[in-house]
Amino acid sequence: MSYENYLAGDPVIITAALTGGVQGKEATPHLPETPEEIGTAAAEAEEAGASVVHVHARKDNGERTFATERFQEIDDEIRRQADDVIIQHSTGGTGASDEDRHLPLRTDPAPEMASLDMGPMNRYDHLTSENTRGLVDSLHEEMVERGIKPELEIFNDGHMNETYGLLDRRDLADPVYGTLIFGPGTLTPPKPRNFINAIDNLPEGAQFNTLGFGRHQLPFVTMGILFGGHVRVGLEDNIYYERGELATSNAQLVERVARIADELGREVATPSQAREILNL
């Protein structure tokens, strides 16, 4: 994917990351946490232009959970309230057991997509997301068994190397779909040069998604549009609409990037178009 894909006006897939597993309503009252709230947020995001919703689960007290039953409740609400949006479960999580990381894959029906973190990360002072090759392989194996498309989350250059390692070890259905992630800490430093290097280093034929954390969300998704890629926005990654002003909803962030894509001449993909692009 490249600037030529932008010039060709290829459709852009917008993913809405609705909730996340870190901050809660103490950070913003607009963050959806209950299954009903997440279902409503998914429907609103789809109406605004999202074809994929990235889903984390929370307990009633707002804490993160990997329980299959909770993901099932959320999926049921999304399917009840939304139209045709693609559900993508998160399997990422600092401090979670390997077994817990598999639980989001076991809903009935399975999600059409799920995230797959490509390597270790330092996230907090005393906790690390290990994401060993053994865990990555076992998650990928279960995704294949259940017909789930993996979304490879590439947080840094080392994870790009791990992506090639996964391709050497296992068969991945075309197209490979990777999310390039920019921000603080272990993430790729949010510099335009690093973005260009990342897309140049992608496996041949791969489709890429662009994610910038916090204030980097808007400039990086705009670059993603201009370089023929796909984009992710949402309250998981950024709770502000502009400096000092909280976003009122996930849909508000989706509406803005959909408008930018339209003004730059790229059609916003429908869920059916996204399924065709990603070979779901």
PLM feature spans:
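N-terminal small/glycine-rich loop or linker at the start of catalytic domains
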Residues: 4-30, 115-122
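Histidine-centered catalytic micro-motifs
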Residues: 16, 35, 39-40, 50-64, ...
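Active-site mouth loops of central-metabolism enzymes
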Residues: 16-39, 90-99, 125-129, 153, ...
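Glycine-rich, proline-tolerant flexible connector loops at the mouths of alpha/beta enzymes
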Residues: 26, 51-73, 181-182, 238-243
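Active-site beta->alpha loop and helix N-cap motifs at the rims of alpha/beta catalytic domains
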Residues: 35, 65-131
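Conserved, mostly hydrophobic/aromatic
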Residues: 38, 45, 56, 114, ...
